[in-house]
Amino acid sequence: MLHSLILKLKWLVSCRKLLGRQASYYPEAAHKSRLRIVHDQLRFFFKYGYLEEYYYPYGFDRAEMTRAQMGEYIVPYRAFLYRVDQLNFQNPGFDAYEGRMTGRVLNQDKFYFFLFLRQLGYPTPRVLLYVRGGKDLYADPSVSSLEGLFSTDLDAFAKPVGGMMGAGGFRLQVRHGEIRVDGNVTTAESVAARLVSADYLVQDYVVQHERLSALCPSCVNTLRLHTVMDQDGKVHAFGPLLRIGRVGNAVDNWAKGGVIVGIDKSGRLFDRGVMKPGYGTVTVEHPDTHVVFAGYELPFYHEAEAMVVSLHRLMYRNHSIGWDVAITPHGPVIIEGNDRWEISMIQAVHGPMGHLKHYFQ
């Protein structure tokens, strides 16, 4: 008990910047005093053991934001993330023994995820090569081996098989013997050294629909869709949003400076995008391409939502999943299913999600 308290106090000290004033995501509103902000955060800490890391993206700094209104949000972020993780480790829809046979491996191992989806006939990028322990564990016949990867014209994306938040991912292009990583000319030796430095998956690069490319052409901009399975086995979709990268970046992740925008029931974007603290606040248009978000229609949105709901029914050992779905000219393609998705992105664009709490008790 004492050890746990000491650890939390150390974490509180490391997060002391959260007690100060930061850039507001609602600059037009009247704001709380620093004393009120500190009071709110300390109340979170003593009630839950954590500060609220997304206090400002949620607009808690607005003077009009009451304690009751803050209570409509799922807070604090970190405690809920642990709860999501716990439920995906042992889905309450199973008994204690069955629940230990977790389905998380299908989400956390991107190679297994690919095999599972391909067997079921769901569209997902083809795996060209899987490098594990410094050796090519699996190679598609089109490349045959790690060395063969560089003797075939290809457009691919490489990522760590257990990676998160876009870390380590890069675009790989080979054409007439010229090799490029994220657009820059390089050598086969350099790429090979990078691939054997971790367990890497190399997949076909997804060509996105022109409506998505217009927002940011340098990366694949993906829908982030969320589903949760109740104890009766029914799957519910919630909190849809679009992740948009920044020009020059190979990934669209919020943690890499990307912009997230909520999606309404008709498949159109909300009127403002949100950036992660440290990268900016809000914007009504893309910072680089200047495409206005309000009412921007996304193709194949309803097809994408129906696809992930049907797939979650088959991944029944997962309690909840955050899906990354690309939109191509021919329809949705499932990139990943994340078992440690973040409520912060959803509430930053959709507002309070307290009505979902009963699924996570």
Residue ranges and their predicted role:
Residues 154, 182-275:
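Phosphate-binding site of ATP-dependent enzymes
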Residues 1-25:
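Intrinsically disordered, low-structural-confidence terminal and linker regions
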Residues 134-138, 165-169, 234, 248, ...:
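Short catalytic/ligand-binding loop motif for oxyanion handling, primarily in non-cytosolic enzymes
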Residues 18-148, 164, 308:
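Conserved N-proximal alpha/beta basic substrate-recognition cap immediately N-terminal to
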Residues 150, 162-164, 216-220, 316-317:
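A short catalytic or substrate-binding loop motif that flags glycine-/basic-rich loops and adjacent residues
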Residues 156-188:
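Glycine-rich phosphate-binding loop of ATP-grasp-fold ATP-dependent ligases
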Residues 281-309, 313-320, 327-361:
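C-terminal active-site "lid" helix and adjoining low-complexity regulatory extension at the edge
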Residues 131, 160-162, 176, 204-206, ...:
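Short, flexible loop/turn elements at secondary-structure junctions
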